[in-house]
Structures are given as C-alpha cells and as structure tokens.
Amino acid sequence: MKILFVIVLAAFFIGVHCKHGYPVQYSGREKGCKIACVINNASCDGECKRRGGRAGYCYFWKLACFCEYLPNNSPTWDYKTGKCRV
C-alpha cells in the first residue's frame, strides 16, 4: 500500500512541473508570436518535442500550435503579456 501511495505521489509531482500552452517564435520578424499552422499536426508535434514537450497539435480555431507538458522554462504565449510584432 505504501508503494502505491509513493507512485501516485510521484506522478502528481511530475505533473506539477509541466505546463501547456502556445509556444512562441524565438527570433525573426515574428518574435514573440504564436507558431502559426493550418492543419499540420506533424509539424506542431515536432516543434513541441524539440522544445521539450510531450506532444503538440495544430489548434484549428486559433490557427496556432499548442503544446502539452512543456518544461516550465519553455516560453509560451500569454494573452496578457503576449507581444507580437507583426
């Protein structure tokens, strides 16, 4: 029973150190903008995995890549502070 408790507790803490969100462009003209897509889940998944996430997909209504389980140090777009220079 104690082992099960430790496993559940460890899984909880692993989940706490991750975030979900829209990854942003690092450089160039669109620095600070969400990564655009139309229907290409494969490119979004690859981009998210390069940034340390577990999975990614093209969120169709926002026309932007969305990543799941990103590390906390990976920059993501925020509605309040998002500054897109395009």
UniProtKB/Swiss-Prot annotation:
Among the GO biological process terms of this entry, one is: defense response
| One of the record's GO cellular component terms | extracellular region
Q: Keywords for this entry? A: Disulfide bond, Ion channel impairing toxin, Neurotoxin, Secreted, Signal, Toxin, Voltage-gated sodium channel impairing toxin
Keyword Disulfide bond recorded: yes
Disulphide-bonded residues: 33-84, 37-58, 44-65, 48-67
Please give the start and end residues of each transmembrane region. none
Entry's SMART domains?
Knot1
Give residue ranges for domain LCN-type CS-alpha/beta. Answer: 19-85
Q: What is its main location?
A: secreted
**Tissue specificity field:** Expressed by the venom gland.
Give the domain of life.
Eukaryota
* UniProt comment concerning the protein's domains: Has the structural arrangement of an alpha-helix connected to antiparallel beta-sheets by disulfide bonds (CS-alpha/beta).
Role: Binds voltage-independently at site-4 of sodium channels (Nav) and shift the voltage of activation toward more negative potentials thereby affecting sodium channel activation and promoting spontaneous and repetitive firing.
The record's comment on protein family reads: Belongs to the long (4 C-C) scorpion toxin superfamily. Sodium channel inhibitor family. Beta subfamily.
* Stated name of the protein: Neurotoxin LmNaTx17
Originating species: Lychas mucronatus (Chinese swimming scorpion)
Q: What is the lineage of its organism?
A: Eukaryota, Metazoa, Ecdysozoa, Arthropoda, Chelicerata
